[in-house]
Structures are given as structure tokens and as C-alpha cells.
Amino acid sequence: MDVIPAIDLLEGRCVRLYQGDYDRSQVFSENPVDVAKQWVDEGATRLHIVDLDGAKAGKVVNLGAIEAIAQAISIPIEIGGGLRDRSSVEQVFNLGVQWAILGTVAVEQPQLVQELCQQYPGQIIIGIDARNGLVATRGWLETSEVLATQLAVQMQEMGAAAIIYTDIHRDGTLAGPNLDALRELAAAISIPVIASGGVSSVTDLLSLLALEPQGVTGVIVGRALYTGDINLKEALQAIGPGRIQDIPPNLDFSSFA
């Protein structure tokens, strides 16, 4: 399972929000590039970046920071926040980003999503941010009447590469992932589901690993990495591609003699 560190950008700095509340942000670093390099050094194979200013403004705002990160590291990057038109998506791909995460437009302009999926096959991910099972939009400032599972099925039909599912009530809280919601979503679609929100411990990661056979292929970890509740190297050893339980046991009992 992929363990994907998150970098949330607000005014060019690396921050974490509590339940998506912009008034409850905590700055973890003034230099997002250094943070990105740290996660790469600790074994990350993919990076999740959110332009929080962009999510609010409806257009990409932290272009400079995103470009600097993309140039500084060699692992693939996915980016979301403010990607609500074709030019914004083209803009981030031109910076060297591998995946664009679309959220609000999935609800408001599904036809555009379909066109982008055709233009960039395998590179469009849908971010479904849910509050009590309903999809939130516009930087989580609005809640729609659309069910998360309903949108996931529609986006799969449009050609989306994967779904990132965030439970807003748990995001930034270290309260643990919403396993029931993830199970329900993964059962409804056949494309990969990436979990996000609430992960606080290796125990949480192992509980998500149990959902891997059902289609939950990755987990985005944010606050817990920054507070030290989760060590990235240990997380990768626990559930990553080369995890300890995937290594065949040494059955040479002579070593115990």
C-alpha cells in the first residue's frame, strides 16, 4: 500500500488545518521544499500537495512553491486545490506534476472532467471530500446534496484514474480513518481508492491495510507525520510495498541454536 505524505500550502508555507478550518491552521515549516526533500529521504515514493489558497480562490495560487518542489524532487507528485478549469490543469502539468486532483468541478462540471480524463488518461484523480456522506466543495466551504458513493461511480464512468476519499470530520484530528465509509466506497467502484483524513498511528495504517484487497491502495498521511505520531520509515515498513510481512521468513532454524 502506498503511504503518501501530504504537504498543504497556505501563503507559501507548509501548514495543517483542523477539520478543514482555515482559521485553525498550524504552520509546520516556512520552506515546503525542505519538507518535500525530507519525505523523499525517508522513503516516500509519491507526494500529495494541496494548494489551500487555491482551493479557496478557485485557481492555483501557490505556483512558485509547487514548481520549486517539482524541480527539487524526483518522485511523482499529485496536486489538488483550485483546479477548476482546463487551463489550471494544464498549468500544473506543465510544472512537472504527474496527477491533477479535481474536486469541485467533479460536482459542478462533470463533462469537463470527462474531457480532461480523455486528454490526460491515467492522470486525473478525483478528490471526494465528504461530510456525513455528502460531498463538500469549494475548499470544503460548501456541502452539496451529492452522495460520495454516487459521485465516485459517476467519475469512474468518466475515466478517472483513482478516487481520494477524505472524511472532513476526521481530517487533521488524528481521530482515525472512517473505515466503514472507505469500505462502502471501495465496494461501489473498481478503480483504486486512496484514504485521507484522521490517520494517527501505525495501528490505523494496519486497519487500512486490511481494506487493500477491496481496493484501498494508498493512504495520505498529514498531521501525524508532522507531530511525530507516525514515523514515515516505520509506516512504510508496516504497510508499504516492501513491508515486513511480505518478506518471506527465514526458516533456517540453525540461527537459533
Swiss-Prot record:
<dbReference type="GO" id="GO:0000105">
    <property type="term" value="P:L-histidine biosynthetic process"/>
</dbReference>
<feature type="active site" description="Proton acceptor">
    <location>
        <position position="8"/>
    </location>
</feature>
<dbReference type="GO" id="GO:0000162">
    <property type="term" value="P:L-tryptophan biosynthetic process"/>
</dbReference>
<dbReference type="InterPro" id="IPR006062">
    <property type="entry name" value="His_biosynth"/>
</dbReference>
<dbReference type="Pfam" id="PF00977">
    <property type="entry name" value="His_biosynth"/>
</dbReference>
<keyword id="KW-0368">Histidine biosynthesis</keyword>
<dbReference type="InterPro" id="IPR044524">
    <property type="entry name" value="Isoase_HisA-like"/>
</dbReference>
<keyword id="KW-0963">Cytoplasm</keyword>
<dbReference type="InterPro" id="IPR023016">
    <property type="entry name" value="Isoase_HisA-like_bact"/>
</dbReference>
<comment type="similarity">
    <text>Belongs to the HisA/HisF family.</text>
</comment>
<keyword id="KW-0413">Isomerase</keyword>
<keyword id="KW-0028">Amino-acid biosynthesis</keyword>
<protein>
    <recommendedName>
        <fullName>1-(5-phosphoribosyl)-5-[(5-phosphoribosylamino)methylideneamino] imidazole-4-carboxamide isomerase</fullName>
        <ecNumber>5.3.1.16</ecNumber>
    </recommendedName>
</protein>
<dbReference type="InterPro" id="IPR013785">
    <property type="entry name" value="Aldolase_TIM"/>
</dbReference>
<dbReference type="InterPro" id="IPR011060">
    <property type="entry name" value="RibuloseP-bd_barrel"/>
</dbReference>
<feature type="active site" description="Proton donor">
    <location>
        <position position="129"/>
    </location>
</feature>
<comment type="pathway">
    <text>Amino-acid biosynthesis; L-histidine biosynthesis; L-histidine from 5-phospho-alpha-D-ribose 1-diphosphate: step 4/9.</text>
</comment>
<dbReference type="InterPro" id="IPR006063">
    <property type="entry name" value="HisA_bact_arch"/>
</dbReference>
<dbReference type="GO" id="GO:0005737">
    <property type="term" value="C:cytoplasm"/>
</dbReference>
<dbReference type="GO" id="GO:0003949">
    <property type="term" value="F:1-(5-phosphoribosyl)-5-[(5-phosphoribosylamino)methylideneamino]imidazole-4-carboxamide isomerase activity"/>
</dbReference>
